[in-house]
């Protein structure tokens, strides 16, 4: 409270990037941090790969922002790669047509994640 920060990224068991092993979120530490930091918005870095249930619980326990940039990047690149290598792509193909499917995929993911944060 003395620092007057709006948000603080905390380490409670996740890391940047996507990993094959399941994140082991330390909920006791999250509760303790929330109790000590009061109104400061807590941020979870490394939300990519965190299960939907864990995300919901993090929000219930006080997390205000969850970063999932790696998931967004991965999906965007996958869709762009498929679109750019399609048989009907020519040098005259509009960028809107090439990037539109990737933008739609990101929109779907963001809507899905936002639904997890509504409790």
What kind of region is each of these model predictions?
Residues 1-38, 52-57, 61, 81, ...:
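Alpha/beta enzyme core
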Residues 17-21, 46, 94-101:
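Conserved short-loop catalytic and cofactor-binding motifs
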